[in-house]
């Protein structure tokens, strides 16, 4: 078995090393005085990237004529008024299995505050630290929560629901459809889901 001598690549051109740079040469700056040549040997001998920097304006050798353009500006979402928000959340209002609209039993503001407080003080599967964290979130927002009529209607529906799983589904659907409740409703959901039955 013969041992092949190793070749030194210290004093050679990049083109002499097979597979050294498989990237297309179009990515690197090109001498503007030298146009595209037909013979590949002449092209490989000329140095395409003397400075080693990527070119910002590349001479197109492959026939692509489109230049890069800036993307269109990002459009802002239109602001939603409270009336539009309530109309978007109408799907959350009380519906039974046959999709008939039922008359919700509305609770007063005081009744809802009492029910939320009862929910927080009854037994919970959450640790006391978690429960305190979520309770603080609710307590800090309770006055703002109960100013909105739609919120009072949905909370009344949730508290009057006999099936806890249906109430949890209602809360989750409400969270998806109404963005105005995002600062307190996840905490309410956590407390509601983990509340122990009386």
UniProtKB/Swiss-Prot annotation:
Cellular component per GO, a single term: cytoplasm
Main location: cytoplasm
Keyword field: Cytoplasm, Phosphoprotein
Compartment annotation: Cytoplasm
Triggers of expression: In response to the DNA-damaging agent MMS.
GO biological process, one term: ERAD pathway
Miscellaneous notes: Present with 1270 molecules/cell in log phase SD medium.
Function text: Involved in ER-associated protein degradation (ERAD).
Protein name: Alpha1-proteinase inhibitor-degradation deficient protein 37
Organism: Saccharomyces cerevisiae (strain ATCC 204508 / S288c) (Baker's yeast)
Gene name in the database record: ADD37
